[in-house]
């Protein structure tokens, strides 16, 4: 099953048309494209991690795909990274204009008032990474301490879904994971893919419950007004998803090395492809004649 590039582009651009129609800030007054300034957090597998001076992870590969898409549409677009240490710093970077895009973020209706989301390239939700004999249900977590990343969607889900648990805040995913490794805390709440990617770092740990709380798509987000950047992001992500479905070598490498069979997450290829088909089916026709 294939989506013709033209049909895919129409679907992606129609998404941007549904976003806010405010001033487009992806080009300067001279018409030159504004560089991609991406928020990144270190040690946030499978999305982003820093090795020396180089960033790797699913977010980085997606950002490079968006950079390539923008460079094909305009002149060469530069990609730079704005490293932050907490969710609050990430929000500040976006609202201040220091950064104009962030990837690896779960969809939230509340946050959609401030930012526009691209197509998702993964699906997440909140799961608990724990060394205790709990099953992750509200009953089993009564009175239990749960580490959360302050300001994150999982932190909000702990508050709403596990109200009788005792939430302990950490500034970053790395700080929460370190506390779990050191035995400072027995359970932390994180994105489902993040929890799976880091489970091997904590001997004897497991993920609960079986089904995540607050299951939602994971993609990139830009501030309102960046309509052309949103369109480029949607087109690049759509092509990445379609490439994976069609067995494109580079698309398959990107996805499998981050969340597929070649990664600690280990999602099955047919399940990834089924999800990507469902995503693309909402924005462009997929059929034998296309």
Please describe what each predicted stretch is.
Residues 42-45, 53-72, 106-107, 123-181, ...:
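Bilobed "Venus flytrap"/periplasmic-binding protein-like clamshell domains
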Residues 14-17:
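C-terminal motif of bacterial Sec signal peptides marking the signal peptidase cleavage site
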Residues 1-7:
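Bacterial N-terminal signal peptides that target proteins for export
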Residues 19-55, 135, 139-145, 275-290:
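Immediate post-signal peptide segment of exported/extracytoplasmic ligand-binding proteins
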Residues 75-140, 206-207, 211-213, 280-287:
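Acidic, polar ligand-binding/catalytic clefts
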Residues 24-105, 113:
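Extracytoplasmic small-molecule ligand-binding "clamshell" domains
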Residues 19, 57-70, 134, 140-145, ...:
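Extended ligand-binding regions for polar small-molecule ligands
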Residues 41-43, 122-132, 196-238, 259-286:
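Periplasmic-binding protein-like
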């Amino acid at each position: 099953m294939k989506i013709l590039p033209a049909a895919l582009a129409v679907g992606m651009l129609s998404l941007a048309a549904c976003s806010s129609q405010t001033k487009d800030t992806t080009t300067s007054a001279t018409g030159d494209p504004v560089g991609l300034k991406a928020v990144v957090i270190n040690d946030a597998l499978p999305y982003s991690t820093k090795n020396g001076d180089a960033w790797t992870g699913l977010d980085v590969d997606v950002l490079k795909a968006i950079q390539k898409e923008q460079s094909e549409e305009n002149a060469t677009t530069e990609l730079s990274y704005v490293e932050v240490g907490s969710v609050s710093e990430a929000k500040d970077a976006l609202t201040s204009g220091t950064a104009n895009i962030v990837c690896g973020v779960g969809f939230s209706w509340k946050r959609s008032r401030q930012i526009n989301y691209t197509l998702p390239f993964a699906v997440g939700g909140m799961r608990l990474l724990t060394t205790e004999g709990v099953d992750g249900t509200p009953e089993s977590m009564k009175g239990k301490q749960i580490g959360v990343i302050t300001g994150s969607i999982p932190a909000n889900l702990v508050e709403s879904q596990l109200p009788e648990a005792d939430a302990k805040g950490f500034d970053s995913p790395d700080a929460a994971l370190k506390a779990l490794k050191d035995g400072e805390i027995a359970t932390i709440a994180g994105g489902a893919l993040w929890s799976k990617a880091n489970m091997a770092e904590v001997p004897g740990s497991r993920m609960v419950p079986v089904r995540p709380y607050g299951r939602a798509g994971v993609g990139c987000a830009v501030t309102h007004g960046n309509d052309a950047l949103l369109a480029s992001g949607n087109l690049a992500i759509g092509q990445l998803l379609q490439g994976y479905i069609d067995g494109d070598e580079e698309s398959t490498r990107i996805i499998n090395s981050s969340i597929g069979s070649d990664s600690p997450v280990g999602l099955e290829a047919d399940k990834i492809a089924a999800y990507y088909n469902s995503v693309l089916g909402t924005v462009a026709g997929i059929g034998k004649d296309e």
